[in-house]
Amino acid sequence: MRDGVGQDVIERLGSRDLNDDGEIINLAIVGSSRYYDYSNFESLIDSWIEMNGYPDLIIVGGASGVDYMAERWAVNNTIPVAIFSEEWDDPRRGLEDRGRPEAPNSLTEKILKSSSHILAMPSATSKWTRVVIKEAKERRIPIEIHELE
């Protein structure tokens, strides 16, 4: 369900206007690893596209929940996806959270450096996603936030 190791995909595709619309959109999608409502996820990303344009590349951290649904959405829509699974000690992924430890700081930095836009979907228990939100705001990376219940 992926195009390759995250950093390799970024280096190969990250600076290209893959859909020839005149704009490069490298959309990082981050959010709760315990959120599994694909229908709502799809509505949120469709709404984002209406406002911002079609992404050339989807960037995810390789966790469960929102990250996994973003991978699935990218594949279903024939959009390349960069998955930073190399940042995890336990690279096994799936839709449901299996209690893997929090993401390393290096993952946060790679996602922020690679993205032109961020779509964040945190829940009340999201820690890492809130770090990404804070850093994106400080760096003035365009970000849209949808709080999940």
Describe the function of each predicted region.
Residues 2-26, 33-149:
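Acidic/glycine-enriched connector segments
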